[in-house]
């Protein structure tokens, strides 16, 4: 099971937020791929 991405801090920059969204998307893809 891949580690879940850390939640961005409340004062995270837009760049950090977009990086976080990408990490979450990759994380979800990894999980769904492992299931099938």
Swiss-Prot record:
The keyword Secreted applies. One of its GO terms (biological process) is feeding behavior. PROSITE patterns: PANCREATIC_HORMONE_1 (PS00265), PANCREATIC_HORMONE_2 (PS50276). The keyword Repeat does not apply. One of its GO terms (cellular component) is extracellular space. Keywords: Amidation, Hormone, Secreted. InterPro entries: Pancreatic_hormone-like (IPR001955), Pancreatic_hormone-like_CS (IPR020392). One of its GO terms (molecular function) is neuropeptide hormone activity. It is found in: Secreted. It holds the Pfam family Hormone_3. The modification Tyrosine amide is found at residue 36. It comes from the Eukaryota. Belongs to the NPY family. PANTHER family: NEUROPEPTIDE Y/PANCREATIC HORMONE/PEPTIDE YY, PEPTIDE YY-RELATED. This is Pancreatic polypeptide MY. It comes from Petromyzon marinus (Sea lamprey).
């Amino acid at each position: 099971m891949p580690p879940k991405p850390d939640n961005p801090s409340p004062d995270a920059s837009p760049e950090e937020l977009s990086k976080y969204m990408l990490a979450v998307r990759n994380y979800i893809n990894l999980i769904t791929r492992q299931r099938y």
